[in-house]
Curated annotation (Swiss-Prot):
Native organism taxonomy: Bacteria, Bacillati, Actinomycetota, Actinomycetes, Mycobacteriales
Protein location: Cytoplasm
The name this protein goes by in its record: Phosphoribosylformylglycinamidine synthase subunit PurL
Protein family: Belongs to the FGAMS family.
Residues annotated as binding Mg(2+) 1: E106, N569
Gly residues bias: start-end ranges: 245-259
Keyword Iron: no
Gene that this sequence comes from: purL
Gene Ontology molecular function terms on file: ATP binding; magnesium ion binding; phosphoribosylformylglycinamidine synthase activity
One GO biological process term: 'de novo' IMP biosynthetic process
Start and end residues of each stretch annotated as Disordered: 1-23, 245-269
Amino acid sequence: MTQEVDTVERAAATPGQPQPYRELGLKDDEYERIREILGRRPTDAELAMYSVMWSEHCSYKSSKVHLRYFGETTTEKMREIMLAGIGENAGVVDIGDGWAATFKVESHNHPSYIEPYQGAATGVGGIVRDIMAMGARPVAVMDQLRFGAADAPDTRRVLDGVVRGIGGYGNSLGLPNIGGETIFDASYAGNPLVNALCVGVLRKEDLKLAFASGAGNKIILFGARTGLDGIGGVSVLASETFGGDESGAGGHEAGGGAGPSRSRKKLPSVQVGDPFTEKVLIECCLELYAADLVVGIQDLGGAGLSCATSELASAGDGGMRVELEQVPLRAANMTPAEILSSESQERMCAVVTPENVDAFMEVCRKWDVLATVIGEVTDSGRLEITWHGETVVDVPPRTVAHEGPVYERPVQRPDTQDALIADTSASLPRPATGEELRATLLAMVGSPHLCSRAFITEQYDRYVRGNTVLAEYADGGVLRVDEQTGRGIAISTDASGRYTALDPYAGAQLALAEAYRNVAVTGATPVAVTNCLNFGSPEDPGVMWQFSQAVRGLADGAAALGIPVTGGNVSFYNQTGTTAILPTPVVGVLGILDNVSRRLPTAFGSEPGETLILLGDTHDEFDGSIWAEVTAGHLGGVPPKVDLEREQLLAEVLTAASRDGLVSAAHDVSEGGLIQAVVEAALAGETGCRIVLPEGFHDGTGVFVFLFSESSGRVLVAVPRTEESRFTAMCQARGLPATRIGVVDQGPEGGEPTVEVQGQFTVGIEELRRTSEGVLPGLFG
C-alpha cells in the first residue's frame, strides 16, 4: 500500500482533521450528526458511505415525509395481492396459478445527459438487476423518455445516444422492449428524463428478499470486477442541479462529444455497462435460486458496496464483517472509499450458508461468473469493514441505510399558479371548416408530439423470447407468462408533465387513469401500480408543493381504484440553473389476463365492416392539450376532469367484452383526442374508416370538440357487426355511455383506404402515414 489508510483507530486519534464532506454532498449538520452517531470523526471510508447513502437519491430525505402517504392510504384489501412492496428492490404481486410478477421503474436522468449511451444503457441494466434480486427472471422492459424540443441543437446528441443505449443493452440481454413514451418539450432541454421499467416473473415460492441473516453465513460478491466508474453517481450526479451554463453545449453527432464543459468533469460518475456480462449473471442467478443456494441477495447499483452491505446488514438480524481487500478490482491502487463508492455495473451480493458456498461457487464457475467470499454475517449488530487487517468502517448499519436525515422542506403553492390557471385555451382560434379541421389534423399528426415513434421503436427488439403478445402500436404491452394456460400480464406507463404543471394533484391522477385505461384496453384487469416521480429541486418550495400534491393525487387515485402502489422512485434536482422541468410523475400499471389469446389489439380491420363505438363522454377540454401546444405553443388553464369510477367501469366492460368476444379492437383516447386515436388504429390495421358526427356536435365548434378534445375516461372500440347489439346492451346495463360513431371501411377495391369525417373532410391513409412517419427520420435520421 502506497498511501496511509484512514482507520477507525486513526480517526479516533485525530478528531480535528479536516474532511471534504461538503464536496461529497453532505451539509454541515449532517456531518455533525455522523460524528455524534460514531462518537468521533468518520474515517474516509465511512464518510464515503454516509455521503452516498444519505444522498437525496438513496435516502429519500426530502420526499420520505410525503411518501408515507402511500402506506397510509393502502388498505388491507389492497395489500392482499402484494407479496413485496415499498422498501424492497421492486414490488411483487400475486398474478394467480402460483405465479407472481415483479415490476419497477427507475430514473437515470442526469447520467443520460452527460453520456447518453452509457447513461441509458446502465439505466436498463440497473433496473433489470433490481428485478433479478427479487428472485425473478426479467422478461421485458419499457421506457419513458423526455427530451428537449425536437429541433433544439442538443436533442439529436442526447436522443441518439439514449435510444442506442437502451436498444444496445436490452437487445443484448434478450429482453423485449414492449412499449413506453417519447415526449419532446423545451423544459427537458438540459435535463432529459430516462425512466426505465423492467418486469419479471417468478413462482411465488421463489421470492427472494434483501437481508443478511444467520451469524456465520458468508457474504459473496459475484459478477464483474470493481472499478472507478460511477463513483459519486448518486451523491453528486443524481442529487444536485445542473448549472445554468450547461445547456446546449457539446457535440451533436453520435459519439461527438460528451456534452457541456462542466458536465465533462462528471464523466467518471457515469457507469459503464456490459450487457453480455449481465446476461450471464441473470442465468447464473436463476440457477442459484433454483438450487436454493441463496439466503438473501442485493444488487449493486447506486452507492455500490456501500448500499449492498449496509442495506443487507440493516435489514437482517445481526451485523456484518467485510474484508475489503478480497473485492476483485479492475483498477490499481483503489482506496477503500473508492471501492465502497464504486458503481461498477453487473455485480450482485449474496448471503450464503457455509455448507452451500462450494455449490454456489460451482454454479458461478459454470457460468464463468467471478465470485469471491468477502465477509460474513455476525451477531455484533454493527457493520465492520477491514482493509488488510485494519478496520476502516465500524458503524451501526441502520444509521447508514435506513436512519438518514429526514427533511420537512417548505411547501408553497407558487405565486404564478393562479395566472397559469387563468390563462386558458378558450381564446385560441379554433378550426371551423372541413378544410381547417383537415389541416389541423395533419399539423398534429406531423408534429414531433404525435408523430410515429417507429424510428425509435424499430431500434428495439420487441418480440425476442417469443412471449410478447402486444407491443407495436399497442396501448399497453402484453406478455405470456405460462405457455400451458395462456396466463399473461399487461403493463403500461404514462405521464403528462403539461397537465401536472397546471394541477399536480389532477395531473398525477390523469397519468394513473391513462396507464390504468391502457392496461384495460388490452383486456387485462389492472391490479397494481409503480411510479417514478421526476421533479425539480426540493429546495424550491414551489417544487415541493408540486411534489406533495402529485403524491397525494396518485395515492388517493390508487386507493379509489382499489389497487396498491407497490414501490417507486423519486428523482429530484431535474433542472438547469433555476429552470425546472415540467413536473413529471411517471405511473406504471400492471394487469392480469387469464388467457392472452383474448387480448384486444389496437388495429382496426380484423373483422370486415366493424362498427366504431366511443365509450365515455366528450367535453370541451383543451387546456394543456397537444392541440394548444402544436397550434399556439400554449400551456395554461385547467386539465381535463378525472372520473376514477368511470375508469373502473370502463375496465370492467372491456374485460368482460374481451372475455366474451364482443370487441375486436380497443384504443385509449388521450393526446390528440378521438381523431388521433382513429388515425393510429387505422394505420395499425392498414384500413380506412368513416366517422359520423353524433348528435350535439354538428354546430359551431362542436365538430372540433368532438374530434380533438382530450377529455379523459374514453376508449374507442371496434365491434363486429354481429355483436353490436349485445355490446351496446351490456354498456347500457352498466351505465357506460356508448356512442356509435362510424364503421371501418376498406375503401373501393383497388383504391386507397381513407379516413373520412362525414360532411367535413377526407384524408388518405398513405398521406397520414407519410406525414406521421417522416417526422423523426427527418429530424434525427
